[in-house]
């Protein structure tokens, strides 16, 4: 971005922040597809490795293309620092592992992506870290679950796939009063619709695989927070364990950021149109969309989000059998477990993202056998609605 004292708006930062041009002055950011770097002297090599002078030493540690992506994400999020990872789950796992050690305790909302819940319930205990899962809406449960060893609060909001929205500022206050840090998975909101750091969160994580790429091409993740948090808790983990984002994927994600605002705007319009079209449909028993006034957390949404969502969820009659009949009748919309794509996609959480949970656990989270998660793409809303309504006739 040009040197200036101006504060640019998010749409401008998405296009210009972090740009590092080579001596050739290319208009499109360069892809530095290299493992290592040549040093002008042995002394320079020693100084770079010791950290006495800045510079790249190995692309597992950092890379100019990765740096451009990280700087652009930090500018968009309003964070002091960002670090990229190979996947969203690498970002989540690193964000949690970097804040705990044996004997520590984590409090997390129950409504989590299946892999996130596995990390908390199955992986962290192998290293002596215990956890308590709570109803994220109930602030009293966050307080009650806190112990003297609690070091981390973790939530995703809006949640996957029920689109619950938690009060980030209120939970951050509880965490900080307990001496803990709050980590927020902000993937469903995107940096454009929700800013957890300004609401009191200490760390924000993303699966860049979703909206940031936006076209179903590559995997990636991001961890954002203060410079001190990143250096004290994550720098060495990322450097030594190697969950590194590839330079090629960083370049694809960097280019994806340029169109994020226009894509998310169109996707949100489509998701809202679909939600309104399905509301009250005789084959739909439940509809959840953060942009509608009937959302259970509508007040929280108005307080902390700038718009609704690119996703909506709805439950069809007939349980799993009804859901499968609906899914198999779709002609335009694809069945997959991804989201945030240019193409509209649907998922059956019971048999995919949340399959490992027991029926009772899914029921507790509001994930019925007939629940469908819809991720809006860039198609014309009328075509999407027509496909959905036609498929509902098969239920």
Predicted features and spans:
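Conserved PLP-enzyme active-site core in the AAT-like
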Residues: 2-5, 14-20, 81-283, 288
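PLP-dependent enzyme catalytic core of the Aspartate aminotransferase-like
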Residues: 1, 121, 130, 148, ...
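Active-site beta-loop-alpha junctions enriched in small/polar residues
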Residues: 158, 187-189, 292, 317, ...
């Amino acid at each position: 971005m040009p040197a200036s004292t101006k504060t640019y708006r998010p749409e401008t930062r998405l296009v210009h922040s972090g740009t590092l041009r080579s001596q050739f002055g290319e208009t499109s950011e360069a892809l530095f597809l290299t493992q290592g770097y040549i040093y002008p002297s042995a002394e320079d090599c020693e100084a770079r490795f010791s950290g006495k002078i800045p510079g790249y030493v190995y692309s597992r540690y950092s890379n100019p293309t990765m740096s451009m992506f990280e700087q652009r994400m930090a500018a968009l999020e309003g964070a002091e620092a960002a670090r990229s990872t190979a996947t969203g789950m690498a970002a989540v796992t690193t964000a949690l592992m970097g804040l705990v050690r044996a004997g520590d305790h984590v409090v997390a909302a129950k409504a989590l992506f299946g892999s996130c819940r596995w990390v908390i319930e199955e992986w962290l205990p192998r290293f002596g870290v215990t956890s308590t899962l709570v109803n994220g809406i109930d602030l009293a449960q966050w307080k009650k679950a806190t112990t003297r060893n609690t070091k981390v609060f973790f939530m995703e909001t809006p949640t996957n796939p029920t689109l619950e929205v938690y009060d980030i500022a209120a939970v951050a206050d509880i965490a900080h009063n307990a001496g803990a840090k709050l980590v927020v998975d902000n993937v469903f909101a995107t940096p454009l619709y929700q800013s957890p750091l300004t609401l009191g969160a200490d760390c924000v994580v993303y699966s860049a695989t979703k909206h940031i790429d936006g076209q179903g091409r590559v995997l990636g993740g991001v961890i954002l927070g203060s410079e001190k948090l990143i250096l004290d808790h994550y720098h060495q983990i990322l450097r030594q364990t190697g969950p590194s984002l590839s330079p090629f994927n960083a370049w694809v994600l960097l280019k994806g950021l340029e169109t994020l605002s226009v894509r998310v705007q169109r996707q949100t319009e489509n998701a809202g149109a679909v939600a309104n079209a399905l509301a009250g449909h005789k084959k739909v028993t439940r509809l959840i969309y953060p942009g509608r006034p009937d959302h259970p957390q509508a007040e929280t949404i108005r307080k902390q989000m700038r718009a609704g969502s690119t996703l909506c969820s709805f439950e069809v009659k007939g349980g799993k059998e009804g859901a499968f009949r609906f899914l198999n009748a779709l002609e335009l919309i694809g069945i997959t477990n991804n989201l945030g794509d240019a193409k509209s996609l649907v998922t059956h959480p019971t048999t995919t993202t949340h399959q490992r949970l027991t029926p009772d656990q899914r029921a507790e989270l509001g994930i019925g056998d007939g629940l469908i998660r819809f991720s809006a793409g860039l198609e014309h809303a009328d075509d999407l609605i027509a496909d959905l309504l036609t498929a509902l006739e098969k239920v």
